[in-house]
Amino acid sequence: MKKILDFFKENNIEIDNLSHIFVNQGPGNFSGLRGSIATAKGISLSKNLILIGFNTFLWSSTKFIEKSESILSFTKFREKYSFQEFNKNLKKISKIQLINKEELIDKYSNQLKIFPKNIAHTLDKEILKLKNVKIIDLDHNDLELLYSKNLLDKDLIKPLYLG
């Protein structure tokens, strides 16, 4: 909580001026996700703020809204790749799937594949050589677009675990 308060102070943000809190639901570290979500829920309840949840798969896909019929948004978990498929309006086409490198290359080599820049250093070289691989910067401003299109969770905010 101290880090959050320090962040507010350093950036001249008054918590009383906030109306919403956005919290990443994952995928990610078990303890980190639970801690982040619990903190966000606590602040939202105590200050009567709207709590909005998002996941990295959807967030990563935002730059490609209405640009591709199919968007595969990936992250890497240990030696496996997890992904979720979205249509051009960022509606889910698939549930989250966990596959290995060979499956990714065999089944999805020609489709648009998106990876967040913060995991690019963990990607296998063979994956980086595939067609239609995009490494993207995650931009917090994209969350406003997702919110305006009603694509974010507003009800049950819960962690997204892989494994």
At which residue positions do the language-model features occur?
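Oxyanion-binding and handling regions
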Residues: 56-163
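Glycine/charged-rich beta-loop-alpha catalytic/anionic-binding loops adjacent to active sites
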Residues: 17-25, 124, 128-130
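A short linear-motif detector with a strong N-terminal bias
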Residues: 1-3, 30-32, 52, 139-142
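DPxDG-like acidic metal-binding loop motif
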Residues: 20-56
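Stable alpha-helical structural segments in soluble proteins, enriched in small hydrophobic residues
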Residues: 3, 7-11, 40, 46, ...
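N-terminal beta-alpha supersecondary unit
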Residues: 1-23, 98
